[in-house]
């Protein structure tokens, strides 16, 4: 697999609090993007050149946000909060939190609880995306170990979990396995696959929901 850089746009805007952009999601008609910054209690809407639309961005009573995804008809946003390892549903019309679902409150959490120390470390949930074919939600745990976790559409049940490990192709020539991180997720409906990005590895990987690696490329 080969990736080609088409354009690059700066989106960091410290004046607006967008200091550490984390996660990116495209709206249904492809006209705008949403992102979060883990040190700012806000949802930011951007145009396709990375410029923040102040009137369409809004504050929210949550911090430590690390990933974001639009769901359904663009009426709600799903964001992950790393510190609590929760999925938060935000109503885009009212700009308010609709619900908050910690992984620890979901059915089958006992099968992955040993991967999440208490109190939480800084290696929790980092990315989120929605499978638009069945509305299942995927979240990714950053590292130690990296986990790909599939949730049902109601965010009440953990359906499956896969450890992202060397035997599945998740390796980097310059990083030990325990140092490789997983920073973001995106679902590709055209091929029914997931894209996983690694910050430390500087790579983007294409995988199935069962964490079978198709291909990987440096970015």
Language-model segments: residues:
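Structural signal for beta-propeller blades
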Residues: 41-44, 85-88, 145-148, 202-205
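Beta-rich, blade/repeat-based domains predominating
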Residues: 15-29, 61-72, 107-133, 172-190
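Short loop/turn segments that connect beta-strands within beta-propeller blades
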Residues: 47-51, 91-95, 152-156, 208-212
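Beta-propeller domains
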Residues: 1-3, 34-57
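Hydrophobic, aromatic-enriched interface-forming segments
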Residues: 120-165
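Surface-exposed loop and turn segments in beta-propeller and other repeat-based domains
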Residues: 2-16, 58-60, 98-121, 158-178, ...
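Conserved beta-strand positions in repeat-built beta-propeller and related beta-rich domains
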Residues: 27, 34-39, 71, 79-83, ...
